Amino acid sequence: MAAVQATTGIQANTKTSAEPVRPLANFPPSVWGDRFLSFSLDKSEFERYAIAMEKPKEDVRKLIVDSTMDSNEKLGLIYSVHRVGLTYMFLQEIESQLDKLFNEFSLQDYEEVDLYTISINFQVFRHLGYKLPCDVFKKFKDAISGTFKESITSDVRGMLGLYESAQLRIRGEKILDEASVFIEGKLKSVVNTLEGNLAQQVKQSLRRPFHQGMPMVEARLYFSNYEEECSSHDSLFKLAKLHFKYLELQQKEELRIVTKWYKDMRFQETTPYIRDRVPEIYLWILGLYFEPRYSLARIIATKITLFLVVLDDTYDAYATIEEIRLLTDAMNKWDISAMEQIPEYIRPFYKVLLDEYAEIGKRMAKEGRADTVIASKEAFQDIARGYLEEAEWTNSGYVASFPEYMKNGLITSAYNVISKSALVGMGEIVSEDALAWYESHPKPLQASELISRLQDDVMTYQFERERGQSATGVDAYIKTYGVSEKKAIDELKIMIENAWKDINEGCLKPRQVSMDLLAPILNLARMIDVVYRYDDGFTFPGSTLKEYINLLFVDSLPV
């Protein structure tokens, strides 16, 4: 979570200095204020949507298991179900159908199938964890030149499908590497000549492919941009809209709860130098899991991440190096007695932090899940130590080597705190074995963590350099390998691209853990892309995040 320095700001007296020199910041204020505090959940309306979903839900279930439906039509149906965020409702039925179709797969069956249909089939299998071979696309390449046939460039829907398919590639799938570059260029060259829904679909995909987008937002956009696909099955379209309205009410209530909690904590009074970003943080966490059963998990993870913003901005944009050392020591002790050693301005935060974790710990202990709270707390302590190391580097003017930077940078990216805190309220899914797998730092987790660090760095390095803060991965790479700034950025982008391939592979069957545990790992990488692909969307949330918040919580979907 990068910050941008200004020359003016708040100063406060502390025990260490009457007028300390601070790395002051002047963050843009919240664009929302108390807007979401006034929401009132109509429980009867909420219940009506739940009841109204039952009939179309059963109708869609029957469609999914319909044995008379053509396989391509069936996969097209499942694709739409997945795009509107309903896979979790029918996972058993969908996997039963896909198991059968995958086992019957033959490359010869695709010889007479068009590019768009093959792309839809490929995406369905890959999204749901089945490693359909990328050889299904070989027939679209010229056998002599090895390049894609010029004939596919007249099939915009087919090219769009291939471009989306390419985002699901793993290492070694050269044909999809080539497709991604080739098709992106072709789509960019024709997008302004297109009209209607197809134009919007291409623009949406070029801006951010579905696989790298926020699931709830992608579902919402699907209603608008894929009207024909949605309306081909009336029961699915009806269920999807009712489901979205149901989620909207639940999530507005959750946003109200965390907004009130934040206001009650008085952070804007006790630490007024921080970024006020409650809806943005809630959106971030919502991006990890939107399913109704994770309501408590979202509330807990949002609260902990809001604590993290206070800590981050205190270290990065307010505290002196002496205060940072004292605060880090207090974080290591994690005891109320340590409050006397830290500056007065941060004491209310420290007390609330300890109290809230204790309260969450008690609640989870009753469910036999205290270990997830301990993991979250330890990650919080780790990031404080990481922030201290960054501060010491800045204070001494030290630029770390790239390996040294990455070792600490993966901690200070905040990925570890957010991802472990996301596990706290997930329930029985996070078993002792599942948590042990997570703590083993598996490859998909490493990849998502790397994306979190480097995507942030690529977007914010200039800001950080201007404000005189610690060197980013871009600076460390330049120093270590003696390359130009452009070369460093290009190399980091390749690392990000390969990390996506590793995540994709980690989500394919056979998996070490359930997709329920892998989904937040995948989705956190997606949210990093949402926040940092085009700008520092967290510090300056007036663009993408504002658009998304409006889309989900302000501009209601008509039913």
From Swiss-Prot:
GO terms for molecular function: germacrene-A synthase activity; magnesium ion binding. Mg(2+) 1 binds at D312, D316. Its cofactor is Mg(2+). A motif (DDXXD motif) lies at residues 312-316. The Asp-Asp-Xaa-Xaa-Asp/Glu (DDXXD/E) motif is important for the catalytic activity, presumably through binding to Mg(2+). Belongs to the terpene synthase family. Monomer. PANTHER family: GERMACRENE-A SYNTHASE (PTHR31225:SF120), OS04G0344100 PROTEIN-RELATED (PTHR31225). This is Germacrene A synthase. It comes from Tanacetum parthenium (Feverfew). The gene is GAS.
